[in-house]
């Protein structure tokens, strides 16, 4: 039998906690036998003293085991259970293509996703712009979709990692969110509860990233790879660029439109293609669906070219109660904004810098995201035809096309876009889309 205050004292004094102590504390968070004050105190001691790798693994596993852990054995699937997690960005619509692409290559992707957070868009919010799309199928239906289609994208239910929900709520109001061991455990508790064979992490770097510096993004990626492998799940991470909007669009319905166009081959933004492909390659090689990167790329290109990936996306939408002909007729189903108009720069020049975070917040301000949990989302608003770093803009080439609910909202968004995009006399050096791959 442990005492919560003794566990806090031990960590406060700089000592490592045992697996049993960590499990006792996390189970107490779940069972409400540990108070909010005690959660806050432990979070702050971890913030200042960090955690050893064994402590990090124990914390992650204890949080995972605080709820249901999915088990796929009874389905006798003929491929690996794999997933991807992104730390979030703007125009980061990779999940919508990646899930179907990997499923079309023989993987199974039980993707449990989130809503928008701060300036970053949420995969669930994007999918809910599709009429009827059900992000909370019951457990049996979820398993059926995985078995039949190969991919489902759903919301987190209360039975998955419940200790994380309470722990995070306390961290949020006590300035302990940005602690690498706590972020790692929070991300992985939910992902590892999916019962995965392999995981790839997409850790963003730059002005629209969750972590403020390259070094911190790198430290987070290394921590996640170390802990997830320590927990028995083959995991790699890619550090990818978020110094500009990743897709050509940012919003909800506008990003779903771009995802369908990507899958059908109608239009593929080159940077979005690079990042999506790199993540899919990791999933295929880690999941043993391809012997090397070259074979993985060839398989992925084939399912894009022969239409299989688009077909899987359509089947997923239909299985989750969306329209059965969504891929063919997406324009008919997706909501459109009242006012669609381009915004131009005041001077000519090359796009040299982009405050991606500010652009994400501009989408939220238009109604495309939530400022508080109770807010309703306007799925139709956002940006399309976004200028990229190095593009020459003038009276002919806009900075973006703004989809707004009215003139007032358009004016505010136009102001935000102009402030967020800096111009120069010459094009900047091009930045890589993938900076580094991290493996164990």
UniProtKB/Swiss-Prot annotation:
Coiled coil: none
EC numbers on record: 2.4.2.4
Pathway membership, UniProt: Pyrimidine metabolism; dTMP biosynthesis via salvage pathway; dTMP from thymine: step 1/2
Enzyme class: transferase
Keywords: Glycosyltransferase, Transferase
Cellular component GO terms, alphabetical: cytosol
GO biological process: pyrimidine nucleobase metabolic process; thymidine metabolic process
MF annotations from Gene Ontology: 1,4-alpha-oligoglucan phosphorylase activity; thymidine phosphorylase activity
Pfam families per UniProt: Glycos_trans_3N, Glycos_transf_3, PYNP_C
Reactions mediated catalytically: thymidine + phosphate = 2-deoxy-alpha-D-ribose 1-phosphate + thymine
InterPro entries linked: Glycosyl_Trfase_fam3, Glycosyl_Trfase_fam3_N_dom, Glycosyl_Trfase_fam3_N_dom_sf, Nuc_phospho_transferase, PYNP-like_C_sf, PYNP_C, Pyrmidine_PPas_bac/euk, Pyrmidine_PPase_CS
HAMAP family in alphabetical order: Thymid_phosp
Homology family: Belongs to the thymidine/pyrimidine-nucleoside phosphorylase family.
Complex formation: Homodimer.
Task of the protein: The enzymes which catalyze the reversible phosphorolysis of pyrimidine nucleosides are involved in the degradation of these compounds and in their utilization as carbon and energy sources, or in the rescue of pyrimidine bases for nucleotide synthesis.
Protein's UniProt name: Thymidine phosphorylase
Gene that specifies this protein: deoA
């Amino acid at each position: 039998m442990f005492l919560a205050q003794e566990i806090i004292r031990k960590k406060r004094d700089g000592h490592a906690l045992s697996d049993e102590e960590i499990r006792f504390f996390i189970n107490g968070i779940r069972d409400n036998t540990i108070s909010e004050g005690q959660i806050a105190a432990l979070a702050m001691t971890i913030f200042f003293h960090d955690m050893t790798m064994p402590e990090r693994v124990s914390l992650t596993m204890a949080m995972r085991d605080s709820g249901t852990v999915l088990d796929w054995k009874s389905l006798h699937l003929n491929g690996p259970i794999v997933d991807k997690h992104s730390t979030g960005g703007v125009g980061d619509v990779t999940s919508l293509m990646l899930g179907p692409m990997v499923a079309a290559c023989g993987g199974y992707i039980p993707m449990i996703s989130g809503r928008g957070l701060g300036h970053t868009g949420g995969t669930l919010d994007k999918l809910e712009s599709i009429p009827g799309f059900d992000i909370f199928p019951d457990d049996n239906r979820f398993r059926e979709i995985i078995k039949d289609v190969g991919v489902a994208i759903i919301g987190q239910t209360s039975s998955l990692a419940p200790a994380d929900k309470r722990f995070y709520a306390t961290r949020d109001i006590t300035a302990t969110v940005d602690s690498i061991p706590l972020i790692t455990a929070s991300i992985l508790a939910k992902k590892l509860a999916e019962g995965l064979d392999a995981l790839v992490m997409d850790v963003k770097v730059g002005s629209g990233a969750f972590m403020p510096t390259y070094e911190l993004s790198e430290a987070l990626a290394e921590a996640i790879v170390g802990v997830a492998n320590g927990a028995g799940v083959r995991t790699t991470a890619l550090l990818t660029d978020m110094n500009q909007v990743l897709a050509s669009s940012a919003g909800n319905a506008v990003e779903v439109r771009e995802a369908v166009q990507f899958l059908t081959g109608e239009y593929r933004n080159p940077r979005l293609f690079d990042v999506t492909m790199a993540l899919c390659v990791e999933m295929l090689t880690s999941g043993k669906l391809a012997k090397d990167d070259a074979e993985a790329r060839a398989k992925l290109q084939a399912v894009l070219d022969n239409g299989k990936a688009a077909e899987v996306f359509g089947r997923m939408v239909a299985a989750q109660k969306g329209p059965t002909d969504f891929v063919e007729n997406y324009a008919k189903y997706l909501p459109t904004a009242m006012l669609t108009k381009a915004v131009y720069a005041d001077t000519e020049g090359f796009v040299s810098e982009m405050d991606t975070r500010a652009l994400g917040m501009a989408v939220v301000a238009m109604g495309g995201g939530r400022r508080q949990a109770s807010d309703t989302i306007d799925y139709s608003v956002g940006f399309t035809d976004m200028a990229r770093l190095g593009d020459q803009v003038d009276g002919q080439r806009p900075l973006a096309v703004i989809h707004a609910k009215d003139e007032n909202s358009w004016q505010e968004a136009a102001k935000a876009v102009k402030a967020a995009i800096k111009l120069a006399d010459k094009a900047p050096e091009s930045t890589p889309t993938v900076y580094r791959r991290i493996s164990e």
